[in-house]
């Protein structure tokens, strides 16, 4: 095996610590070609699609990419921001927020972000850390709930990059923070602030709050993936923080792909059923998405909204994701700081002189 070239030992002697925020990824542009390139990488990950690759690659290349590339590009174009993809824009803002917060608290760390699919990728970010003299790395996935198809594959990519290094850094991983008090507080604050600006649902009159998490195939639950249980845990803690019960709030799962059974109840049919049952207002919040993206802005804000209205609902509210919210940046900083304990990340303080 050929290892990557190492920087000069004088650079490696900097003994710096790096924090790498890792999110899913996004196309570089809202065009069919860019979307197909992104989807090809994403859907070729055996952690994401757990069927024999020989069969799957034929279907992917001949049917799925040609059909979904153009359709998905139109959806991305509908949510694209002037600065670029929403997921990348908000992840960059989160990175800058954490960087500033840690620096203001005397942490001497390098903070950056990477995407599991697309760019900047994890290997590139770790290589940049190495060039900067980083010898300790904290991998911080932006997935509060652990899943093999998100958290584990992010770690896979990081470990694959490390396997090519002759001089490897120390590494720590943040596996999940689905029940972390600071994360739950940030979620509750996001909902409260939205209601303060747009009015609180009239729960006594039957209005509902729906907590929509990204779905995964049900078989992963049967095979031991803890994702479903952690989503339910987050949902229960958020309901408690908001003073709500399952009569006013429910947990659903979105973004089903293919014909296999996924975690239920499904978000879109649930919203249509609520509208048909006479629910006047439905608010939807996506606690598992730490940054707004195609699945929240387009799928929830447009497709699911249409389902609710078609069912007979009157008022639909999509509560924005955590994005760059002050409470969320604080929560990220707190979780990162907890996982940096024991590493020399602050400047040495001189001894007090009596």
UniProtKB/Swiss-Prot annotation:
Which source organism does the UniProt entry give?
A: Burkholderia ambifaria (strain ATCC BAA-244 / DSM 16087 / CCUG 44356 / LMG 19182 / AMMD) (Burkholderia cepacia (strain AMMD))
The terms describing its cellular component in GO are: cytoplasm
- The signal sequence is none
**EC numbers, comma separated:** 4.98.1.1
Residue stretches spanning the membrane? none
Indicate what this protein is called per its UniProt record.
Ferrochelatase
Superkingdom, taxonomy of origin: Bacteria
Its family remark reads:
Belongs to the ferrochelatase family.
Pathway recorded for this protein:
Porphyrin-containing compound metabolism; protoheme biosynthesis; protoheme from protoporphyrin-IX: step 1/1
Major localisation: cytoplasm
- Summarize the protein's role: Catalyzes the ferrous insertion into protoporphyrin IX.
InterPro entries for the chain: Ferrochelatase, Ferrochelatase_AS, Ferrochelatase_C, Ferrochelatase_N
Sorted alphabetically, which keywords does the UniProt record give?
Cytoplasm, Heme biosynthesis, Iron, Lyase, Metal-binding, Porphyrin biosynthesis
The Gene Ontology terms for molecular function here are: ferrochelatase activity; metal ion binding
Q: Residues that bind Fe cation, according to the entry?
A: 214, 295
Q: Which CDD domains match?
A: Ferrochelatase_C, Ferrochelatase_N
The record's annotation in HAMAP family points to: Ferrochelatase (MF_00323)
Pfam families given for it?
Ferrochelatase
| Record has Transport as a keyword | no
């Amino acid at each position: 095996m050929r290892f990557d070239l190492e920087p000069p030992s004088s650079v490696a002697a900097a003994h710096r610590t790096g924090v790498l925020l890792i999110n899913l990824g996004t196309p570089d542009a809202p065009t069919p070609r860019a979307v197909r390139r992104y989807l090809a990488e994403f859907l070729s990950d055996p952690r994401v699609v757990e069927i024999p690759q020989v069969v799957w690659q034929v279907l992917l290349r001949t049917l799925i990419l040609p059909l979904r590339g153009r359709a998905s590009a139109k959806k991305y174009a509908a949510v694209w921001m002037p600065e670029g993809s929403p997921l990348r824009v908000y992840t960059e803002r989160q990175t800058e927020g954490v960087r500033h917060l840690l620096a203001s608290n005397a942490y001497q760390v390098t903070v950056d972000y990477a995407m599991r699919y697309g760019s900047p990728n994890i290997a590139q970010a770790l290589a940049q850390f190495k060039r900067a003299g980083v010898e300790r790395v904290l991998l911080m996935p932006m997935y509060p709930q652990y899943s093999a198809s998100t958290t584990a594959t992010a770690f896979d990519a990081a470990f694959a990059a490390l396997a090519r290094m002759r001089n490897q850094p120390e590494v720590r991983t943040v596996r999940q923070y689905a029940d972390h008090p600071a994360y739950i507080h940030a979620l509750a604050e996001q909902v409260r602030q939205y209601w303060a600006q747009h009015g609180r649902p009239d729960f006594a009159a039957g209005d509902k709050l729906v907590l929509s998490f990204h779905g995964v195939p049900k078989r992963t639950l049967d095979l031991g993936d803890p994702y479903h249980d952690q989503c339910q845990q987050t949902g229960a803690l958020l309901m408690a923080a908001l003073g709500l019960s399952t009569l006013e709030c429910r947990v659903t799962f979105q973004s089903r792909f293919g014909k296999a059974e996924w975690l239920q109840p499904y978000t879109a049919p649930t919203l249509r059923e609520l509208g048909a049952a006479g629910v006047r207002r439905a608010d939807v919040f996506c606690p598992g998405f730490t940054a707004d993206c195609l699945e929240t802005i387009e799928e929830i804000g447009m497709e699911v909204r249409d389902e609710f209205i078609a069912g007979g609902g009157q008022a639909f509210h999509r509560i924005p994701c955590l994005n760059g919210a002050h409470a969320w940046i604080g929560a990220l900083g707190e979780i990162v700081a907890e996982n940096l304990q024991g590493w020399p990340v602050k400047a040495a303080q001189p001894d007090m002189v009596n």
